[in-house]
């Protein structure tokens, strides 16, 4: 497990974007060899998406041979609703890059048979050869995707009832009106993300500090679903200083002492212009 600590949100976002960029380019994707990327929504990854868009606009990175699978989607919210995760992804990322819309997979929260939709999503991931890099964020209660506290750590894509803490946190996106906030969602399972060949979790802000502490300094616990990634062979937690406030000083010092190693993963930043 790696813990990458940057000074602030912008630097953490840039490090994560550089890592994604380098992983895609090193993979050498092509017509018969797609890189498969798992993606989150929420406020945390916005900075990362902006940097990836910048790399694309500058000609360093193409998503032509990338397939994406999003973590979750609300149930019952129209696809074109401004707060649906379809809208989020297209407005904040997909419409700014060269990805084929047929390769951008997002769960349909309005499907006639929700369980069949979840099963089909799992099958699409298998057909794509599994996920090379799953990027995620977490809530203050340590949930990954919509795997709320108490979720099985071997769970698969399914329908979930949202915890009140999550509904309250999401109310800001619905004019503060709790009655407008969806109470159910389709989500990948913890096991779905664990199956990825690599996982990168973005954690920023003091309000996520206790969750980061639970994720790396205490044991694996289904009440803090992000802690499951202690058992993944290739996990990277990318955080800012504020997110480390609950960690032991020696933990922070240890991982900061490895930054010269971690930075070799993103420096130099590769470019498709160079023929990589």
Swiss-Prot record:
Note the coiled coil stretches, chain numbering. 105-130
The EC number(s) given in the record are 3.5.99.6
- The active site consists of 72, 141, 143, 148
Q: Which SUPFAM superfamilies match?
A: NagB/RpiA/CoA transferase-like
Q: Tissue-wise, where is it found?
A: Ubiquitous, with highest expression detected in testis, ovary, placenta, and heart.
A GO molecular-function annotation: isomerase activity
- Activity regulation text: Allosterically activated by N-acetylglucosamine-6-phosphate (GlcNAc6P).
Which InterPro entries does the entry link to? Glc/Gal-6P_isomerase (IPR006148), Glucosamine6P_isomerase (IPR004547), Glucosamine6P_isomerase_CS (IPR018321), NagB/RpiA_transferase-like (IPR037171)
Where does it localize? Answer: Cytoplasm
Catalytic activity annotated for this protein? alpha-D-glucosamine 6-phosphate + H2O = beta-D-fructose 6-phosphate + NH4(+)
Where primarily located?
cytoplasm
Residues with Phosphothreonine modification: 161
Q: Entry's PROSITE patterns?
A: GLC_GALNAC_ISOMERASE
Q: Which domain of life is it from?
A: Eukaryota
Query: Could you state one GO cellular component term attached to this entry?
Result: nucleus
Q: Which GO terms describe its biological process?
A: carbohydrate metabolic process; glucosamine catabolic process; N-acetylglucosamine catabolic process; N-acetylneuraminate catabolic process; UDP-N-acetylglucosamine biosynthetic process
Arranged from A to Z, the UniProt key words for this protein are: Carbohydrate metabolism, Coiled coil, Cytoplasm, Hydrolase, Isomerase, Phosphoprotein
Per the record, the pathway is:
Nucleotide-sugar biosynthesis; UDP-N-acetyl-alpha-D-glucosamine biosynthesis; alpha-D-glucosamine 6-phosphate from D-fructose 6-phosphate: step 1/1
Q: Which HAMAP family match?
A: GlcN6P_deamin
What family is this? Belongs to the glucosamine/galactosamine-6-phosphate isomerase family.
Query: What job does this protein perform?
Result: Catalyzes the reversible conversion of alpha-D-glucosamine 6-phosphate (GlcN-6P) into beta-D-fructose 6-phosphate (Fru-6P) and ammonium ion, a regulatory reaction step in de novo uridine diphosphate-N-acetyl-alpha-D-glucosamine (UDP-GlcNAc) biosynthesis via hexosamine pathway. Deamination is coupled to aldo-keto isomerization mediating the metabolic flux from UDP-GlcNAc toward Fru-6P. At high ammonium level can drive amination and isomerization of Fru-6P toward hexosamines and UDP-GlcNAc synthesis.
Subunit-level organization = Homohexamer.
Q: Would you tell me the protein name for this molecule? A: Glucosamine-6-phosphate deaminase 2
Its lineage opens with:
Eukaryota, Metazoa, Chordata, Craniata, Vertebrata
